[in-house]
Amino acid sequence: MHRRHVLFATIAVLAASGMVRAGLWQMRRLAERRAFNAVLSARLDSVAVPPDRLPPDTARLRYRRVRVDGVYDTAHELVLVGRTRNGSPGVNLVTPLRRPGTDTAILVNRGWVYSGNAKDVESLPRWRASSATNDSGFADVFPMGQPGPIEIPGAAAAIRRLDIGALGGRFPYPLAPYYIVLFGDTTAKLDSTPARLGMPKLSEGSHQSYVVQWFSFAGIALLGTVLYIRNDLRRMRGADAIGGADTGP
């Protein structure tokens, strides 16, 4: 082998090694996603419980089914802006739920309504509900560590995201360390009920296709290099043979 063949082979092996590592990483991500899906499926298939029976550990309560009853505090309702549904702009309505026997309120995402600018809602009071009676939902945890303000200038009730640290001062009572997303009819009623957000989707994402892609790239890099070197050596031997014939007696 010539020096350039060694160089090409070295580059191909290094590139293939990187591609194999990327494929193995995608395999680990696929295994993690499948494990998460198994937990998610089990929790969504479980029997709905009242909030008082949720696990105290927020990591264990996520996506557990909940049955909610209580009175909505519409005076402190929030409008979660920038939410799309089937390509249409809109908002989510998030309302504190007060329950008997406790001072702690739970924020409840009651669903999506249309908003042309994904911020302002025409006739907002029409979408309000005074109470929840045996409504079904699932618990979720507040996202953490997202930078930037949550307030929208000029819109007192509008927020960019649910951030319990930033929201605490808005309410005259403590908030639960989780919120509830109602599910059910995903079609907004024209009278007063927002479209529910629906159950979380089980998906493995694109990890499996990426595994095949990276391993295929690694194989192509190695095989292509072998074929190139073999053909180049064959060409060189042919050239040597012709040169030898030309210099013969």
Predicted features and spans:
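Surface-exposed, charge/polar-rich loops and edge strands
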Residues: 1-59, 63-249
